[in-house]
């Protein structure tokens, strides 16, 4: 009988390369925020892929590695680099529909510098978005980028194509080890953090590019409704940096915030398996990304 294999896998790449969507596809449920806006993942969220008697893959979903412009950006990059050295395998995500460039080379150099002994697998994402000839050209470019030093797996997290192949490749590269989590667990993140991420995802749909970096969500209180065993009250505060951003989030006569509340409530009800009442408030915390005290208060 083959030895049980287990370990930690870090999915990295430039912002918006499909890391969070891939995490959700591998796990089979939503555990990571998947907005189309760059740099939307703030916390290291672990998803767990378990095959009874065979293997367990613990996925670590990090923010996109980038050249930082704010104190928050620097802290996010530090989080990514710390993760590199603590995992068994790094999965570098490169999208099939974007040419490789200086940003990808910079990340490859960071990996080789910080974690030269960690196994590297290159995952070419979003293959459903390109024709076969363009995919072939991208695979050649990616091979040149890593100088044939890593296995390359093309996948589509949206259609599911090659996802099982990727799981097998990741599992085969892990060392023999125990199951770190029980078979029923899909993530080890607290429910309040997952709720905050789902609210952020709802806010970020269809807004201007500057807002993702300026938005933080804090769950203020979660409590059962008195006399209603089937209803939970969730109170959350959305923090932005400028009054103009507050206007974007709220919208004309509160219309935008109501849309956010409806979308987020549906996702949170799926997460909790019960009805919820979602109460949202928007506050301005001026320049919170550059203020160490504000960062600490908001969980960074």
Swiss-Prot record:
Keywords: Cell wall, GTP-binding, Nucleotide-binding, RNA-binding, Secreted
Region (G1): 13-20
Regions crossing the membrane: none
Region (G3): 61-64
Region (G4): 125-128
Subcellular location field: Cell envelope; Secreted, Cell wall
Gene Ontology BP, a term: ribosomal small subunit assembly
Family of this protein: Belongs to the TRAFAC class TrmE-Era-EngA-EngB-Septin-like GTPase superfamily. Era GTPase family.
Record's protein name: GTPase Era
Organism: Mycobacterium leprae (strain TN)
Gene (UniProt): era
């Amino acid at each position: 009988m083959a030895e049980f294999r287990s370990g930690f896998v870090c999915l990295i790449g430039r912002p918006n390369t499909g890391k969070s969507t891939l995490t959700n596809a591998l796990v089979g449920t939503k555990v990571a925020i998947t907005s189309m806006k760059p740099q939307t993942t703030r916390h290291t969220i672990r998803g767990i892929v378990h095959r009874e008697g065979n293997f367990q893959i613990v996925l670590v979903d990090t923010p996109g590695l980038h050249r930082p412009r704010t104190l928050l950006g620097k802290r996010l990059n530090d989080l990514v680099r710390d993760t590199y050295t603590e995992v068994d395998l790094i999965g570098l995500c490169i999208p099939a529909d974007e040419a490789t460039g200086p940003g990808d080379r910079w990340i490859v150099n960071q990996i080789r510098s910080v974690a030269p002994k960690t196994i590297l697998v290159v995952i070419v994402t979003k293959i459903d978005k390109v024709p076969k000839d363009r995919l072939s050209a991208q695979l050649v470019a990616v091979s040149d980028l890593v100088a044939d030093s890593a296995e390359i797996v093309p996948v589509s997290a949206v259609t599911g194509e090659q996802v099982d192949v990727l799981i097998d490749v990741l599992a085969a590269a892990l060392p023999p080890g125990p199951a770190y989590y029980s078979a029923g667990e899909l993530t080890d993140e607290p429910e309040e953090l997952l709720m905050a991420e789902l609210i952020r995802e709802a806010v970020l749909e269809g807004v201007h590019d500057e807002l993702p970096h300026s938005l933080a969500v804090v769950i203020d209180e979660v409590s059962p409704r008195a006399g209603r065993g089937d209803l939970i009250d969730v109170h959350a505060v959305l923090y932005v940096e400028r009054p103009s951003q507050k206007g974007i989030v709220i919208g004309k006569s509160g219309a935008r915030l109501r849309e956010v509340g409806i979308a987020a409530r549906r996702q949170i009800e799926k997460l909790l398996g019960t009805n919820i009442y979602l109460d949202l408030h928007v506050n301005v915390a001026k320049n919170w990304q550059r203020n160490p005290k504000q960062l600490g208060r908001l969980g960074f």
